[in-house]
Amino acid sequence: MSSTDWILLVIVIVLFAVSIFLAMAETAFVRMNRIRALALADEGSRRAEHLLRMLEHPEQTLNALLLLVLVTQLTSATLLGVILEGTAGALGVVIGIVLQIVLFFVVGEVAPKTYAVQHTEAAALRSTPLLWFLTNFAPLRLLSRGLIGVANVVLPGKGLKEGPFITEEEILTMADV
């Protein structure tokens, strides 16, 4: 492997670690309810105050979060494919695909989401600073809104004038999956 391959491998590992944290954050966020966040905020938790504000408009946080999850996973998979194709050819790509599927499913999705289900409050509060940043980071927010606008052009319709765009029950069902 060349020095470039090693650098790419480090990037893949970092992206995978970020993806794991984002999976935990996503599940914790969708499972957290306003009542519990309000109780934690009343106890003086600054993170709970931020979480409560984000729960008032969950679509803003979820749009940015899901976009970032997609970017980290696709970039990681692509870079690993490039590395393995360069070192082992077509067989390396196949190995990379299988490796990514197993790692992303078990380590990158199931484990962090299970943790978030079992420790919802702790995971939600732990991930709040990152979610708050993502929700308020203008370039990511604008990109997310722009891509949603493109989707609305591709799939036109009246749209919804008022939320909730997704019910709390639907979010909890998605988190359980």
What are these regions (language model features)?
Residues 1-177:
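Membrane-embedded alpha-helical segments of inner-membrane proteins
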